[in-house]
Amino acid sequence: MGSEPVIRVEQLFKQYETAAGAVPVLKDVNLTINLGEFVAVMGPSGSGKSTFMNILGCLDTPTSGTYVLNGEDTGTLNADQLAQLRNEVIGFVFQGFNLLPRANLENNVALPLVYRGVKKTVGATQAREMLEKVGLKGYGNSMSNQISGGQQQRAAIARALVNRSRLILADEPTGNLDTTTSREIMNLFTRLNKEDGITIVLVTHEHDIASYAKRLVRFVDGRIVHDGAMTHTEEAHA
């Protein structure tokens, strides 16, 4: 585990304005995640964990409080700077894969590099490298709608890594997968964390999926009610 914080949140508060008035979603949240950690975030529906992940991903902003990502105070950045920081530091993995159905895997994986203006030949090389890393060597020309769900999620992980991201935010990444495939995907996350030092923050409602992480953060009613290491029993999968 690294000692350098990649995520630091202090006194984070988030509320949404509705016709009935302000609705607080996150209340006085404090959290530091260091480089190389593997953290599971859990909580019941409506606990604030999804809003928290959106803020971590620079897809939403807090009402008040501080969020420092990779040494940058996100509250001091404009929208363009925030987008640039997000694209440089974070790789996203979602439950629904979010691959372009009419594009092959190589082009899907290279997409974040296209947004950054990387030359097509360079992007293609990096995409093939990442596909090989996630166990999809030789699949670059395969169409995303012609492969299995597990292979699609592997491709999505390759896309999250292609920017040399230091941090992966994974939102229910096994939600659409069967038990065996879920285990394969979580073993891949474990390998990326152990061998490459990738920081992983994972939202899940499944205890067996959370048990692959080394640290558990639990939300209830917009507050962190538990933050600690997994027990030895829970670590059995890792």
Predicted feature descriptions by range:
Residues 216-229:
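H-loop (His-switch) and adjacent beta-strand-loop-beta switch element
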Residues 1-15, 226-238:
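ABC-family P-loop ATPase nucleotide-binding domain
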Residues 4-219:
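ABC family nucleotide-binding domain
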